[in-house]
Curated annotation (Swiss-Prot):
Listed Pfam families: ASL_C2 (PF14698), Lyase_1 (PF00206)
Family matches, as InterPro entries: Arg_succ_lyase_C, Argininosuccinate_lyase, Fumarase/histidase_N, Fumarate_lyase_CS, Fumarate_lyase_fam, Fumarate_lyase_N, L-Aspartase-like
Subcellular location per the Swiss-Prot or TrEMBL entry: Cytoplasm
Listed EC numbers: 4.3.2.1
GO cellular component, one term: cytosol
Lineage, broadest ranks: Bacteria, Bacillati, Bacillota, Clostridia, Eubacteriales
Keyword Cytoplasm set for record: yes
Enzyme class: lyase
Organism annotation: Clostridium botulinum (strain Loch Maree / Type A3)
PROSITE patterns (UniProt xref): FUMARATE_LYASES
Protein name according to UniProt: Argininosuccinate lyase
Molecular function in Gene Ontology: argininosuccinate lyase activity
Assigned protein family: Belongs to the lyase 1 family. Argininosuccinate lyase subfamily.
Catalytic activity: 2-(N(omega)-L-arginino)succinate = fumarate + L-arginine
SUPFAM superfamilies: L-aspartase-like
Amino acid sequence: MKLWGGRFKEEESKLMEDFNSSLSFDKKLYYEDIKGSIAHVKMLVNQDIIKEEEKEKILLGLEGILKEIDGGILKIEGDYEDIHSFVEINLINKIGDVGKKLHTGRSRNDQVALDMKLYAKKSTEEVIECLKGLMDSLIKVGNENNYIMPGYTHLQRAQVVTFRYHLLAYFEMFKRDEKRLKNALEILNESPLGSGALAGSTYNIDREYTAKLLGFRKPVDNFLDGVSDRDYIIELISKFSIIMMHLSRLSEELILWSSSEFRFIQIGDAYSTGSSIMPQKKNPDGAELIRGKTGRVYGDLISILTVMKSLPLAYNKDMQEDKEPFFDAKDTVISCLKVMEGIISTLKVNKENLMKSVKKGFLNATEAADYLVNKGMAFRDAHKVIGEIVIYCEDKNSAIEDLSLEELKQFSDLFCEDIYEFIDYKNSINKGIKKEMGYF
C-alpha cells in the first residue's frame, strides 16, 4: 500500500520503488514522526476537524506503534516508501479506516521537515553534552598535570607554557563550539508543521498550538520556506565540521606527543591498538581514526551543500538526500567526542620528559631579551644579542642558564647575577601577564 497512486494508470516499477525508498535510513526518525503526528492529531480535534473519539483511537494506535517499535515487537522494515508511510499504514492496519484521518491538513513535506528539525534539535543537544564531557576531562587532567612544557610555533620549541594551559586552549575551542551549537538551536527553533505541501492548508489549523506542543518557539513565517529550508542541517554539519577540526588538531598533538621522539604522554591501552606483525607496537589508533574521520564529516558538509545549491522552491525529492549526511555527521562527531574524552581522561603525562625538552630548546631566550630591555637596551638590540648567545650555546651544547656570568658579559655588560633568577623557567612563567597561565 502507498500513500498515493490514484492518478496513476500503471504500477511503479520495482526498480523505482527500491530507488525511491528511504526507509532504510529515515527509520531513525520514527520517534519524531510519531511525536509530530500525536501533536497534529491533538490540534485537529481542538479545531473541530476530527471528532474526540477519532482522536482517542488514533492516539492509542500511535502510542501502541511507538511502544511496539521500542520493544522490538514491530520491526521497521518492508516495502514502505518511507518512515511516514510505515507509521501511517501500520496505524490503519491497527485501528481501521479512522487511521486514514491522521494526514488531514498535512503533507509529507511539512511532516518530514518537522521530523528532521525535531531530530536535529535532539542530536544537537546530544553533541553539546558530549562536548561538556570532553571539556570537563580537559580541565581535570590539566589540573592534575600542571607541569612546565615547551610551547611551539611552526612545530619548533618557542616559549615555556604548561601542560594544563595547553589543554585549556582546546577547552576554549570546544567552548566556542558549544556556543555555536546553542546559537544554531535558537535559529532552528521554528516549527514547519502546518506549512502543508508548500501553501498551507484550507483547514483552520492552529500552528501556534502544535509549535508549542512540540517545544518550538514559534511556527515558521513562510510556508514555502518552511518545507524547503535545510539551512539548519547545513549549519549544524558545518559546526560539526569545526568540532572535528578541533578534535583533529588535538589528535595530531596527542599522536606526536605519544611517539618515541617526544614521549610527553602515554595513551592508555584502552584507546590504543597493536600490530599483527610487530609485537612491540602500541599504536594511537583512537586519535588517528578521529583525525581520519574529520574528512568524512567535511564530505557530509559538501554533500548537503551540493544537494541544495540549485533547488527551486519549494520541496524537491533531492531533499531526501539530506538525511544520510546529517545522520553520519552526527554519529561521527558524537563517537569521536566520546573517544577523545576517553583518551584524555586516561592518558599519563611524563613530567620529566616535558622538562627535558624545555631545557633543550632555549625557551627562556625571549625572557633573556626582556632582561636586557629592563636594563635599558632597545628590544631589537637585545634580540640580536640573545640570538648570538644562542649560537654560542649551540656550539657548546649548552643552555643559556648554564653559561657563566663571565661568558654572558662577553655579549653585553648589562648582564648581572640576577639574570639567572630572571630567566629561571618557573620564575619567568609567573612574571607579568604570564601569571594568567596559572602555573602553581
